[in-house]
From Swiss-Prot:
Its main location: secreted. It is found in: Secreted; Bacterial flagellum. Required for the morphogenesis and for the elongation of the flagellar filament by facilitating polymerization of the flagellin monomers at the tip of growing filament. Forms a capping structure, which prevents flagellin subunits (transported through the central channel of the flagellum) from leaking out without polymerization at the distal end. It comes from Aeromonas caviae. Signal peptide: none annotated. This is Flagellar hook-associated protein 2.
Length: 464
């Protein structure tokens, strides 16, 4: 049934009456739902912000609780920064120490070269195969009848089994083609060998009339405090325990023509460790600030709530997390036999629960009891790991905060259904009002019509 303007017949503004009644009913039905939806969405947003802030802090704790996180080493090498001779990197477990290192020679790959009349003239009249070997690496390349030097070069370089060998062609001044093959494999005794499975491909073999070896493969060699060490590559990995030494060039010579040693000092990297602990302090404070903001209670002015609190105002979750964190900080360490808590090594807490780092006191603790500082923070039962695992109970899939989100999302779905039900009730209510006022309008029209007829009769009677 079409809805028309109520009161059109009687001239009375019944439409305004219906509109006012519907608005009042709408407020009665929908406002509680809207208020609850807004409140639920704000809480859901607050839970999301809290999860994100906790995750940011646990990322820092992941670094602190990782094996070797505090085993940072500062490495100083007496050499030119612009033209370094070697690079030294410390691994987890590296110890402090001092070494005198001389780089005697660098590792080299083997190379073969040969001059061909042309790079575009077919070399093969029949199918065949070339085999390349260097050390324990080998691969094969198919050569087709009619292949040129350029074709063979492309097939070698693009071969999926290629172990790093490279082939290049240099066009010489006399119009010929110089083939240069570099094995890509270094180390004593790992010279490149090339063999062909037919006479035509024999030209690629060293001593086959065209190709010859122009450089032998060799190992890198260094002298560490009088001990000669060799490596197939220019990297000496764990030749010195827990150190990775990469040689870049041969050492410089002194006035007598002898190679000079480069002094390598490895010490505890206090700056790096201090920066790591500062990240812990900053991350802790950032999370505290976020929880304080989210959990801020609403204020009251003249007994009226101002709705100026945080998204989790009055929520017990933030208080529980704050309590867990602060209690863990003051709990005696199970790892360190020297320090009971982090407050003994330079970390301080103010009356608002915020942390700060006394760098001087922390530096002294690292100097005197480095292992105990590491024990306090690191290890399975250290502060970082314990705090990390506890906080992740809140943020993990199926954890406390995820469960809260599930409940809140379920509440929102229920409220959406309530909104649909309220809208249906509102539609029925408006239809009932229009039917009711429509009947009234029709009755008023009849009454007006009857009154008009009586008035006409009365006028006629008076005139007669």
């Amino acid at each position: 049934m079409a809805i028309t303007s109520a009161g059109a017949g009687s001239g009375i503004d019944l439409e305004s009456v219906i509109s006012a009644s519907v608005s009042a009913k709408k407020a009665q039905l929908q406002q509680p739902i809207i208020t609850k939806q807004n409140s639920t969405q704000i809480t859901l947003s607050g839970i999301g912000q809290l999860k994100s802030s906790i995750s940011a802090f646990t990322d820092i704790l992941d670094k602190l609780s990782a094996p070797g996180a505090f085993n940072k080493r500062a490495i100083n090498i007496t050499q030119s920064k612009d033209d370094p001779i070697l690079k030294v990197e410390g691994k987890s477990g590296a110890s402090n120490g001092q070494y005198n290192i001389i780089v005697n020679k660098l590792a080299e790959t083997s190379r073969q070269e040969g001059i061909f009349d042309s790079s575009t003239t077919p070399l093969a009249t029949q199918d065949g195969q070339l085999t390349f070997k260097a050390g324990d690496k080998t691969f094969k390349v198919d050569v087709k009848a009619g292949d040129t030097l350029q074709d063979i070069r492309k097939s070698i370089n693009s071969n999926g089994d290629n172990f790093g060998l490279s082939v290049n062609i240099v066009n010489t001044a006399d119009g010929k083609a110089k083939l240069v093959i570099d094995s890509g494999i270094s180390g004593d005794g790992k010279d490149l060998t090339i063999t062909g499975d037919n006479a035509e491909l024999g030209v690629f073999e060293a001593g086959g009339g065209v190709m010859s070896q122009t450089r032998a493969a060799s190992s890198a060699e260094i002298n560490v405090d009088g001990n000669v060490l060799k490596s197939d590559t220019n990297t000496f990995d764990d030749s010195i325990q827990d150190l990775k030494v990469t040689v870049l060039r041969v050492s410089d010579k002194d006035s007598a023509g002898d190679l000079k040693a480069n002094k390598v000092d490895i010490t505890t990297d206090k700056t790096s460790i201090q920066e790591l602990v500062q990240q812990f302090v900053d991350g802790y404070n950032t999370l505290q600030d976020k929880m304080n903001s989210l959990g801020k209670r609403n204020t009251f002015v003249g007994g009226v709530k101002q709705d100026d609190g945080g998204a989790l105002a009055g929520d017990s979750t933030t208080r529980a997390i704050e309590s867990f964190m602060s209690n863990l900080l003051v709990s005696p360490s199970q790892n360190s036999g020297t320090y009971s808590t982090v407050f003994e090594i330079g970390i301080k807490m103010d009356n608002k629960g915020k942390l700060s780092l006394d760098k001087t006191k922390f530096g002294e603790a690292v100097d005197k009891n480095f292992d105990q500082v590491v024990a306090l923070f690191g290890g399975e039962k250290g502060l970082a790991s314990t705090l990390n695992s506890g906080l992740k109970e809140y943020t993990k899939s199926g954890g406390m905060l995820a469960q809260r989100e599930d409940v809140l999302n379920s509440d929102l779905r229920a409220l959406t259904q309530k909104t649909a039900t309220a809208n249906a009730q509102l539609t029925k209510y408006e239809a009932a009002l229009r039917a009711q006022y429509g009947s009234l309008d029709a009755l008023l029209v009849k009454m007006n019509s009857s009154a008009s007829a009586l008035a006409t009769l009365q006028t006629s009677y008076q005139k007669s």
